[in-house]
Amino acid sequence: MTDAYTVLAGRYDRLTSDVDYGKWADYAQRHFAKLKRPVRSVLELGCGTGSLTKLLAERGYAMTAVDLSPDMLTVAEQKCRGLDVRLLCQDMSRLRLPDQVDAVVSGLDSVNYVTRPASLRRTFRRVCDVLSPGGLFLFDVKTPAALEGADGQTYLDEDDDLFCVWRADYYPRRRVCAYGLDLFVREEDGSWSRGGEYHEEYAYTMEELDSFLREAGFRNIKMYGDKVMRAPKEGAQRVFFAARKEL
């Protein structure tokens, strides 16, 4: 198995073609509109191939996008060429920016990929540091119910020249859902090449996340259902957090 997203990077957009980034951008803007001042600069944490960053840049925001994978950022660079986008290869828990931003967004359960609570607490502190006073931090997470429910599941994606198999295993003692991925790609000569990756996501409780945010200096912390402006339902698979840095 190779490092996460080394194999996936060039095929990630095809494998996530069902993700509605436009809806995510719309949702972010609904939260921006609730602030008492305009949002001009936005940071995306865990930007991947830059799909959300590109949309927000096209809507007029000065974007900074951070990801740990150089391969994903290479795709993002091509996608965002000509737009007001700054791309940085950084570990979220060691986040540093030359200037503050008005809002930070993080989607597609990037927070779950920080598998050590101490690292996530440090990440939240760094996010608070780079936000201007009163700034917004908006992110989503898979809930423990979602990760526990994935145990033993197999996921398939395929088309004419791509075949991908995911296997999920949940480990209760570690509170981690591990994904083993096998990717088969048809080459130009008709032969097939195979690659593999290993991913882990941590099952944070909503109470833990709320506590980490408060510890980092955030206030007015609210939870929402999946891209809706109301509280999540019991047993929700995905929850959004919106938190503000103190003025």
What are these regions (language model features)?
Residues 1-46:
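Conserved class I S-adenosyl-L-methionine
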Residues 51-94:
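Class I SAM-dependent methyltransferase SAM/SAH-binding core
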Residues 96-103:
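A short acidic, Gly/Pro-enriched loop at the edge of an enzyme's catalytic core
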Residues 107-109:
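Residues lining the SAM
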Residues 121-133:
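A short glycine-rich, Lys/Arg-flanked "PGG" loop and its adjoining helix->strand segment in the class I
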Residues 138-210:
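SAM-dependent methyltransferase
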Residues 202-247:
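C-terminal lobe and adjacent flexible extensions of AdoMet/dcAdoMet transferase-like proteins
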